[in-house]
């Protein structure tokens, strides 16, 4: 079981969201993997290989 990791979406460029975790790690994720309704400023959690909006 993976620990949850919390992210804030910083920008969206085409098919990719650029986000930063609460610990400062930057990440790039394909939009099709993220929940519908994800926008700039969204708070997300990744847990057990799933993304969820907070």
Each model region followed by its residue ranges:
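Short aromatic-glycine-enriched beta-strand elements
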Residues: 15-19
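Short, Lys/Arg- and Gly-enriched loop/turn segments at beta-strand edges
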Residues: 49-54
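Short, structured beta-strand/loop micro-motifs enriched in basic residues and often containing a Trp
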Residues: 21-29
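Structural detector for short beta-strands of small beta-barrel domains
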Residues: 1-12
